Amino acid sequence: MNELDPIIYTIRPGDTLYNLAMQYGTTVDELINTNLALNPYNLRVGQQIYIYPRYNMPSQDYWISVNQVDLANRMNLAWLEHIMWTRMFLISVAGDLKDLEATKNRLLQNPKTIADVFRKYYGNDIANLIQRLITEHLVIGGDLIVALKNNNEKLANELFTKWYRNADEMAEAFSKINLFYSKEEVRRMLYEHLRLTSEEVENRLKGRYEADIRSYEKIQNEILMMSEFFVNGIVKQFPNLF
C-alpha cells in the first residue's frame, strides 16, 4: 500500500519515468500502473501524472555537478550511437545497400565506446567484460536481422534464444559491479530493448515505414531511460567523484 497521498506532477523537459521513480522513491512499474493512459515512451511536456511518493516530496530543484553532467552526456551519446548504428545496419540489410560492410564495422566500434564510459570507474577487466557482452549482443542481433530477411525461421529462433541469454548474462554482470544495478531491473530494461528492437526490425523488413519510425522513437526513449539508470547507479556508488 502506498504510504502517502498521491501528488500531481507536471512533466518537464528531460523527465523520464526512471528519473521520477528515483526522485520520489517509487518504481517505474508503479508509475505506469497508477497512470494507465500513460505512454512510457512518449512523455509529453506539460502532461500531468499521479505519483505516490514513499517519502516526503523532495524539491524539484536539485543540484547536479559538472562531473555528473559530463558522465550523463558521455553515457547518453554512447547508447544513442548504439541504437543509431543498429538502425543504420538494419536499413542496409533491408535495402541490400552497398554500405552494409562499412556500416557493420562502424556498429561494432560501439561496444568499446560504451565500455570506456564504465572503464573510468570499474577498471579494465570489467570494462572489457562489458565490451565483450555488448559485442555479442550486436553480433547476435545482426545475424538475427539477416536470418529474418532471408526468412530462415529455424536460425532466427535459435538466435532469439541466444539474444535473450546474452541479456541475462549482461544483467548478471552489471548487478555484480554495482549494488544499485538490480539484476531484475537491468534484465527488465534489456528485455524491453530486445522487444522494441524486434518490433523495429519486423516493421522495417515488412516495409511498414511509419510504424518502423515510431518503433525507433520508442527505442530512443527507452535507451535514454536505461542510460540514466546506469548514470544514477555510478553517482550513488561513487558520490565522492560527483
Predicted regions and their residues:
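Primarily a LysM-type cell-wall glycan-binding module
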Residues: 1-25, 47, 55-56
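Short, charged/polar, low-complexity loop and linker segments
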Residues: 59-64, 117-118, 172-175
